């Protein structure tokens, strides 16, 4: 069965380097919206998730990858016959690599007071995919930052198209640390007390 990388990235830096090296190992691409468009613009074939799931993106992009087929492809145990049978019925590509970076919540929070813009940067589908892949680290490799692309490709090259279990565990630990910090930033923002004007004072007066 051909292996696929699910790529969904807000930060599209070094995407050409990543794709160029993945195709050398006969790894296909599955992606969402703008990332899929970017991969195609770079000259690579890419299957769009919404076409594979037969469920269109909805709610202005809030629902893209939250689909049971996507997560089954990431989470199923490769060593379990019952899991293999269930997955086969879905007729969905086998995802062995999940490369996702999250919406820039902190950067947006620091650059605007617009509540709606900040809320839009609370990523839901991205963390879900990363955590699914990290849970199944025995079979699936997960990457959350372009800074890890070179390490990832080097590990693939050394091991002739697969990553080592040591590398997968290391990346999985990074995912849970990363998503935990991301959630903490959101939680802190939600708890912040907004300053409001209580008394209108004349210039020079003290309350």
Model-derived regions, located:
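Short coil/turn connectors at secondary-structure junctions
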Residues: 1-4, 24-27, 42-45, 68-71, ...
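A short, charged helix-loop
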Residues: 97-120, 124-163
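Glycine-rich nucleotide/cofactor/substrate-binding loop typically near the N-terminus or early
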Residues: 34-105
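General beta-strand structural signal in soluble alpha/beta enzymes
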Residues: 7-8, 28-33, 47-51, 76, ...
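Active-site loops and adjacent core secondary-structure elements that bind or stabilize anionic groups
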Residues: 151-155, 163-207
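N-terminal glycine-/serine-/threonine-rich phosphate-binding loop
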Residues: 1-29, 34-52
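Generic structural signal for well-ordered, non-membrane alpha-helical segments
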Residues: 11, 15, 32, 67, ...
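Short acidic, glycine/serine/threonine-rich loops at helix termini
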Residues: 17-19, 40-44, 57-61, 108-113, ...
